[in-house]
Amino acid sequence: MAITQIQLFSVPVSDQDRSRDFYRDVLGFQVLGDRQLTPEMRWIQLAPPRGDTSITLVTWFPTMQPGDLKGIVVETDDLDGDVTRLTEAGVTFTSGIDEQPWGRFATFDDPDGNGIVLQHTTNRVLI
């Protein structure tokens, strides 16, 4: 196999504009593309400023319902600061900061209930 990375994954949402605004304005992702491909399909692609993996905000996969995706893991250099900033922006954390041997993390949901883990790791291997 010559697979080198995960490039993109789809996040099921109910309102693409609301979700784009959340990922862009609250989480600081950059919009890489926003195009209407067909009358039923709009392609919105975003990524963290220093990330290699991007997301698409999708409404057209009937087997992917908004809120079904859990475990979107994003890395931060400043967990405490980002938890404070996100809380001030109206994000409700579903867990407090959890300390582990490999690092620290806190969890919250996007506007549709897709689960996001905000973490700061001290070790690439998480176990």
Language model: regions and residue ranges:
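N-terminal beta-strand motif that seeds the catalytic metal site of vicinal oxygen chelate
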Residues: 1-20, 69-72, 122-127
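Conserved catalytic-core motifs of GNAT/GCN5-like acyltransferases
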Residues: 10, 30-38, 98, 119-126
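Core segments of cupin and vicinal oxygen chelate
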Residues: 11-52
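Short hydrophobic/aromatic beta-strand element in the GNAT-like acyltransferase core
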Residues: 43, 73, 105-107
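Active-site beta-strand termini and strand-to-loop segments that position acidic
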Residues: 46-50, 108-111, 121
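Short, charged/polar surface micro-motifs in flexible loops or helix N-caps
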Residues: 49-54, 63-64, 79-81
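Short, small/polar residue-rich loop motifs at catalytic or cofactor-binding pockets
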Residues: 101-103
